[in-house]
Amino acid sequence: MRVALAQMLILDPKIMLMDEPFSALDIQTRQLMENELLQLWEADKKSVLFITHDLEEAISLSDRVIVLAAGPGTHPIGEFIIDLPRPRDVAEIRMTPRFLQLHEQIWSAMKEEVLKGYQQTKNKLVV
């Protein structure tokens, strides 16, 4: 993962697209890489489009979270400003009252879509 990140940074893109970059990592390595990404962002302040299914990761790394609807005809169903202070440490920020408040707020908006997606998958397996 570090090599892929370094290769992307060599190209000096204006926008970094990161689609589930840490999903295959164990939780400890994931948190180290998330903190490394935050440090890189602090240095250059480049725009990052980060795609993840991990709500905690989205809140920890973002300034804004956009929740999409489940299914092939996806569309935004919610937008949330993440007003957590920077610099951030992902392990520490997740224990703060504001983080927990944001988590609850976003989860409330997306819970129905998660259940809908789960039901769609479940129905495909039964048929």
Features from the language model and the residues they span:
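ABC ATPase nucleotide-binding domain signature region
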Residues: 1-3, 30
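Catalytic Walker B motif of ABC-type/P-loop ATPase nucleotide-binding domains
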Residues: 16-19
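Conserved H-loop
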Residues: 45-51
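Conserved signature/switch motifs of ABC ATPase nucleotide-binding domains
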Residues: 7, 11
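Conserved beta-strand-loop-alpha-helix hinge in the C-terminal portion
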Residues: 70-101
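Short coil-to-helix N-cap segments within the nucleotide-binding domains
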Residues: 24-25, 29
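Conserved catalytic segment of ABC-fold P-loop ATPases
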Residues: 61-67
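Helical segment within the ABC ATPase nucleotide-binding domain
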Residues: 30-44
